[in-house]
């Protein structure tokens, strides 16, 4: 599912769209099914330590004005898949696997976009912290071509992951 927004603002003024969608997904699933999912980084949603959904946010800017004119947010969510290929079976999952879904795709989509539009920005980091898969765990990341390892200690007020590195 995708949504096309036209914010027409400077980059610094953009709402944290990816975080907004991630929070909306985990809250919608919890509300409609009682199933607890988690946020890894900010663009991946996990269920039972396996990836269930991914979020991709792309922005288009105007060279003349320097403003972000368009934002497209795409969400891939495994809704009801019972069998994954062998190479994905240990790392991917679906909201519903062998059981019959208790909700429809349309119900879930509707709830996600409703929450996307209504979760207060001030609550986004709180949801991310509550649903984080990585806080207090060892993580590895790359920055400027160098690989770092450390422990994810905190999520900043703009959704950034703060890591205490080994060096």
Where are these regions (language model features)?
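Primarily the active-site beta-strand->alpha-helix module of PP2C/PPM metal-dependent phosphatases
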Residues: 1-6, 16-19
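Long, positively charged amphipathic alpha-helical accessory segments at protein N-termini or as interdomain linkers
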Residues: 9-11, 19-37, 47-167
């Amino acid at each position: 599912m995708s949504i096309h927004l036209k914010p027409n603002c400077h980059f610094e003024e953009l709402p944290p769209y990816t975080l907004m969608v991630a929070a909306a997904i985990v809250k919608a699933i919890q509300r409609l099914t009682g199933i607890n999912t988690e946020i890894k980084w900010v663009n991946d949603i996990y269920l039972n330590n396996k990836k269930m959904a991914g979020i991709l946010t792309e922005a288009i800017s105007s060279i003349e004005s320097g403003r972000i004119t368009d934002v497209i947010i795409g969400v891939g969510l495994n809704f009801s898949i019972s069998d994954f290929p062998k190479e994905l079976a240990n790392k991917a999952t679906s909201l519903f696997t062998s059981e019959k879904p208790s909700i429809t795709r349309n119900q879930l989509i509707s709830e996600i976009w409703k929450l996307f539009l209504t979760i207060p920005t001030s609550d986004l980091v709180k949801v991310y912290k509550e649903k984080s898969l990585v806080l207090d765990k060892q993580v590895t990341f790359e920055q400027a071509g160098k690989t770092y390892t450390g422990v994810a200690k905190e999520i900043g007020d703009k959704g950034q992951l703060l890591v205490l590195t080994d060096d």
